[in-house]
Amino acid sequence: MFIAAKYIHQKIKSRNKNPNDDALKHATEKKPCPHSRPFQVELRARASVENARTSSQGSTIEEDRVLVPQGLPKSDEKCQVCKKQKHDARVYRWKLIAGLCLPFILATLDLTIVATALPSIASHFNEFDELNWIVTAFTLTSTTFIPMFGQFADVFGRGETLHLSLFLMIIGSVLCAAAQTWGMLLLGRALQGVSDAGLMNVVMIILSDKVSLKESAKTKSLFTLVGGIGYAVGPTVGGCKTSTNIAVIAHILVFILLRHELVEGTMFKKGSRLSGILPALATVDIIGSILFIFGVGLIILATAWGGATYSWSAAQVLAPLVVGSICFVLFFVYEYFLEPGRIFARIFPKQIAMLPYSMFARRDTIWLAIVQFSTGAAMYSIFYYIGIYFSLVEAYPASKAGVQLLYYIPGMGVGVYIAVFLCNVWPAQSFFPLNIGTIVSTVGLAMVVYAIHTQNTSLINGMMAITGAGTGLRFMPATLHMVGVWPEKIAPAQSLMRFAQPFGGTLSLTIMGSVFNNKFARASVVAGGGGLDVHDTNSLTFIADLPEEAQRSVRLAGRDAIMWAYIAVLPIMGLSLVTGLFIGNVWIRPKSKVDEEQRDGLEEEGSHSEVIYVPYLWALLKGNVDSYKKTNKIIPESTSKSAGFNNS
């Protein structure tokens, strides 16, 4: 009788039950962590067998009544493994911040650290006509060696490559500080450029290792701000001894904090003997590296000489331009035949391509490289030619002209902050900050042209801030997007992005220099100045000795020359506007598929990234974005010493 009454009560209760209660309960109940999922599967299987057995015997045992094995966390308890993972993740993040901030600041400092000292350095060596080589020696090597350091990071390990970069910085800084000849100074600057290529590239690779895109976005947000600070304070803390001191401290911090945390090399691992260096070098793409260095280096050299030192039709310009272009094309041909199964891969079976040709099969690689190229063009043009404008046209002293650049840095900071929100909070995607940043930079740089034409100082300062905001908007999303597109090729993907930015800046500077010299040369000769070197700030003093009318003519000619120099780089910005429309999208915090998997306890949060390889706007027009989405699973890094980190 008691059993029958209980049965009737349960039937009435189930009949009156709100059908939405189960859905609400399912939505609000705490999802099982991935570590308890195997136990949950076992429990469900055991329950189904038990229910099938007892139902055949007419038992009234409740269907969901299953004992939890000992040691399995209950619903209201926190999994100890999850707690340890979160703790390890927090410790790892702070180790990265403490260990890599100084190397990253050092890399950004060296781009502008000698800016205010250029006139005095050149006068010391009596080389005013070669002043531009203090900058060119650095930018040339810092651009050409970026992909090589990316491959070194893969073959020899992140830590060893980072220490090598810091060591080269110490040697280069010592040579600069102790330089007795002009050649010795340029050698030191060239070594600093090689070091900068390694530091910038390896730090970005490390920040992408062993973490999800969501976690990487948080850390890279901070380092983007740190980089902006480095660019800003470089001219004020100028001096090669500063670089030496920072490099020594960075060496120590990296060794103490990160020696057990960084990803090991594929060939040269921790504990390997020195005899293992040669077998590891055998896997490096030596021929590709040589072709790339000569190709890019000669192209930069030709554009630096063309229109400034020699005419564009001179053999000194045409020879390096033609040879460099041939080497650059041959590099991509060689990388194509170094793909697995092709002829060079069979001849050199151990070698690994520096920039695998297969990377360009996904079009976002090309579009992103163009966007990064334009980012470098916008940034370098502001850093160098705004100072020339205020010195030449507005007759500001060098110190005051340098202060005007500070308007660019707050704008960059605002852009970085907006990018942090767009990547980490809403909409947590890369497409929107990349395109918004491109639009803002293009509009800002175009308005700089107008402001220079009208000689409106307030408008110039405001547009510098706007351009800086556009630059800051693109820094972090570009690296996150590339990692999302190529999670299995982090080092070469990051190397390509790190190369495109300074390459765009360096080529843009040489183009602007050629345009400026050609436009301004006639006016300065007519005014009796005998010509003006764009990089020689000391030669600007000749204007003050001219008659007032001649001064006005020369300064107006300088204004127009600088305006046309900026107009010359606007097509690069326009090209990036168009290519931005063809970029796909990466969901840094994917929701749909991951949430479903979390309900079943399959994966941890942030262990997936979702990406669209076709143009995102095309997917929107088709009205079915989800059908184009691909899920990139984050593969756990086996070499990690810390639990809970995945290789994005």
Task: Label each PLM-derived region with a short phrase.
Residues 146-287:
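Helix-loop-helix hairpins in multi-pass membrane proteins, especially solute transporters
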Residues 243-368:
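Hydrophobic transmembrane-helix bundles of small-molecule transporters
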